Structure formats: C-alpha cells, structure tokens
Amino acid sequence: MSDGNDTAVHDVHAADAADERFLVRNPRQLRQLLRSLIDQRSLINAHIDGRDRSFPTALLELDEDEDYLLLDGSPQEASNRAAEQADHLLCFAQLERVLVRFRLQELQRVDNDGHVAFRAPLPDELVHLQRRELYRLETPVTDSPQLQLPAAEDRSEALSMRVVDISGGGLAVVVPTDCAVFSLQKRYPAVLSLPDGPDLEIELVVCNLLPQRQPNGIEIKRVGMRFDILPRGGDSAIQRYIFRIDRQRKARRNGEL
C-alpha cells in the first residue's frame, strides 16, 4: 500500500452514531473475529497513527493466555520504523466482504524467524460493519456502472473506473496498489454512470482502503466509499439497477435464461 502521502485524516476509529451498533466489545466475540482474520489469511491495511501512510500486513498469531497478538511487519524498513514509533496503528480488513476495523497500541517490534513483526495487546473493541440492510451487489463485468472523477489539481485527466460492488449506501472500485488518488475520509465529486441510465452527479467519501490479492497473485487496492450526496431519484435508479441484475442472476440459476 501507499508509503508516501502522510496527510492527517480524521480518526475514523472513533465510533460515530452509525458505527456504534457494530462495535464488538465482548472478549469472546472479539477473539473469534481476530482468529478468523488469521485463519482466512485476511490482508490488513495498517494506517500509521491513523493517517494516510499505510502498509499491507496480516495477523500471524493470537496469544489468548497473555492477550497479545503478533502482526506481520512491512518489507519496507521505513514503514517498520514509523510503526515502531507510532502511537497506534488503525487497521482495516475484510471478513466475508464485511469490513473489520480496529486499533492497535503499545506496539513492540520483535523478530519472528528472521522477519520483522510487531507484538501488541489485543484491542479493547473492534468494529464489524455488518450492514445487511444495505444489500451490496457484486456487479457483473459486462454490465457494470462506471465512476468518473473529473480532472483535478493532482491529475490532468479525468479518471474512469468500473464499480465492482454497489448498494444504496455506497460503492467500491479497485485500483492499483500504487494509486495515490484516494485518501481516507476525503470527499470526491464524481459522476456515476448506470448501464440503464441516468448519469448521476454525486459526492463520495472514502471509508476504507483495503489490499486484496487477485487469483493470479496480483495485489490491488479496494476503495470503499459512501454516498455523501445523491441527486433526487438517484437512490431509486441504483435500486432499479440492483434489482435488475439480481433478478437476471436468479433467472439464470433457475434455468430461465
């Protein structure tokens, strides 16, 4: 992930009213979710001091007797030094396409079979964003919405991306790991083009940046964003698209198409 931009962002770990419903404080449930991150070898994006600067990592071990975990270090020594000196790491991951977010403090750099790792106490709480009421549709490659970002000060040309999943609350795109266009909690004006029309002028806020590994081994970055501004009728247009794709998929499964 990005190791360059070090601009401060809002501390998105502070649970707002929307996230409070998804806050996990029960020790048994918290350990279970952390254990699942290990078992599923989930990629984690660790933001140093909750800022834009981040590195990809993974949970290696969970010591439930001493309430400590072991986090893999970065291949870049500069990131390891920054993490060692940081007050905390703000970590984002996914479990079965559901966002997991937690903060690690009191990091201690250790050697793990010749590789850098970090030992840290288990977090006191963890956000598990099970927003099932916002049904997310994984979009078909041949029938996907497109997201266009206009030219800006930091880029001379407009940027067009395929939307990989969408709901009534937001959408996601994937970009190369070295893409520095998106920053946490930053707002972006954009145009969302639905296959059925219309083109919607919207504003998006970046909620998470997650590393992912494709089946061919190539690493990419998934950018999850929520709708901050939708034009009148925009929500209905998005729901119509979701309904059409979902209906077509069910018809194919039933042999009707």
Curated annotation (Swiss-Prot):
This is Flagellar brake protein YcgR. Its main location: other. Belongs to the YcgR family. It is found in: Bacterial flagellum basal body. GO terms for molecular function: cyclic-di-GMP binding. Acts as a flagellar brake, regulating swimming and swarming in a bis-(3'-5') cyclic diguanylic acid (c-di-GMP)-dependent manner. Binds 1 c-di-GMP dimer per subunit. Increasing levels of c-di-GMP lead to decreased motility. Keywords: Bacterial flagellum, c-di-GMP, Nucleotide-binding. The keyword Signal does not apply. It comes from the Bacteria. Residues 130-244 form the PilZ domain. GO terms for cellular component: bacterial-type flagellum basal body. Monomer. Interacts with the flagellar basal bodies. The keyword Secreted does not apply. GO terms for biological process: bacterial-type flagellum-dependent cell motility; regulation of bacterial-type flagellum-dependent cell motility by regulation of motor speed.
